[in-house]
């Protein structure tokens, strides 16, 4: 507890939060199921100091909510008091200061509506991860594809006589 504030962060199932994401809370941040947050994104529910009283810790706070299947682009900033609606996308580098309705794409500084998404079924991370046996098969197939053409001879050659091709 700092300055009388207990921050709380709740993260739903099947979320992808990449390295370099900062989520800081003095009040409440709720991230729904199957959300994706890209590198460098910053999410905060507080000002962290007052405008005129910069010695006072935390400042104003308002909860942040991501509904299910939200995608936050690289280096986006989500400010206090924002709710991002289900299936919405926030573009890379966007600064979001106001609520984003469901099925919307917002980008820019300040973030504005770029596109309305069709109201149809989304294939989410929850679908992708629902069947672990199929997921393992998919990863095996991906490994076979990525490593195709590799051989023991090629590996030994790369150790003994490396060139630009390896």
Briefly describe each language-model feature range.
Residues 106:
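Conserved active-site beta-strand element of glycosyltransferases/polysaccharide synthases
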Residues 1-82, 117-118:
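Flexible, glycine/small-residue-enriched loop-and-beta-strand segment within the central core
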Residues 82, 94, 100, 109:
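Short beta-to-alpha loop/turn elements within the nucleotide-binding domains of ABC transporters
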Residues 85-88, 101-103:
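Conserved catalytic segment of ABC-fold P-loop ATPases
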Residues 36, 88-89:
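Short alpha-helix at the nucleotide-sugar/activated-sugar donor binding site of glycosyltransferases
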